[in-house]
Amino acid sequence: MIPWLAGRPDFPPVEQALEDPDGLLAAGGELSPAWLLAAYRRGIFPWYTEDQPILWWSPDPRLVLIPAHLRISRSLRRTLRQQRFEVRFDTAFADVIAACAEPREPGGGTWISPEIRQAYLRLHELGYAHSVESWVDGTLVGGLYGIALGRAFFGESMFSRRSDASKVALVHLAAHLQRLGFAAIDCQMTTAHLLSLGAEEMPRARFCAGLANWTNEGPGPGRWSCEKAAEISRNFS
């Protein structure tokens, strides 16, 4: 059994999360900014389908990408040099999260419900949630979004409508975070794709101990400048 949360965001210790399914910690609560920010600071995130209550997770181990450790293949470096995409920060957050919410397969479902979308749009308005966008001729063709707290970035989802569009966005994110002194990008669940890009598994205890410091250091909330994205692009040309 897992606890049912209500009232204040008083999450149980992450050590109480289930092993099967890995990381399931609690149910209930809200998707308000106070709840979401309290969760992320503790290494907890929401993930559930539309027919479920809000479920809170903290898997062990945790997949983490150190910004400086991102692996860029030769073909991706060539794409970056050729400037095939214009990369922007925080100009189309609603469009990015809507694209991420589209089912990956015809008839498939999505965990990014309208409720989730509204919650993260609110965090974007408050300066905590950010989008990194890849554009071609004024059309959004890829990107990602996530939460920035102190020196930690919590990646949520990405999408791509053209080859390398989301990878280019990730490269710009990592470069931007490295400039700002961020310690880590939380990738949440382990996937072969993210491992190939340089992400590594970190014991949950170590990850959460890091968060206790990272989320209380570094820059505060606020919009990211598109000029910073343009500077990063020029460095690859």
From Swiss-Prot:
Report the EC code(s) recorded for this entry. Answer: 2.3.2.6
Q: Which UniProt keywords apply?
A: Acyltransferase, Cytoplasm, Transferase
Classify the main location. cytoplasm
- State a GO cellular component annotated for this protein: cytoplasm
Under the heading SUPFAM superfamilies, the entry gives: Acyl-CoA N-acyltransferases (Nat)
Give the EC class as a word. transferase
Listed GO MF terms = leucyl-tRNA--protein transferase activity
The record's disulfide annotation reads none
Q: Where in the cell is it found?
A: Cytoplasm
**Alphabetically, which GO biological process terms does the record hold?**
protein catabolic process
Reaction catalysis annotation: N-terminal L-lysyl-[protein] + L-leucyl-tRNA(Leu) = N-terminal L-leucyl-L-lysyl-[protein] + tRNA(Leu) + H(+); N-terminal L-arginyl-[protein] + L-leucyl-tRNA(Leu) = N-terminal L-leucyl-L-arginyl-[protein] + tRNA(Leu) + H(+); L-phenylalanyl-tRNA(Phe) + an N-terminal L-alpha-aminoacyl-[protein] = an N-terminal L-phenylalanyl-L-alpha-aminoacyl-[protein] + tRNA(Phe)
Q: What does this protein do?
A: Functions in the N-end rule pathway of protein degradation where it conjugates Leu, Phe and, less efficiently, Met from aminoacyl-tRNAs to the N-termini of proteins containing an N-terminal arginine or lysine.
| Similarity comment: family membership | Belongs to the L/F-transferase family.
Xref: HAMAP family:
Leu_Phe_trans
Protein name (database record) = Leucyl/phenylalanyl-tRNA--protein transferase
Q: Which organism is it from?
A: Aromatoleum aromaticum (strain DSM 19018 / LMG 30748 / EbN1) (Azoarcus sp. (strain EbN1))
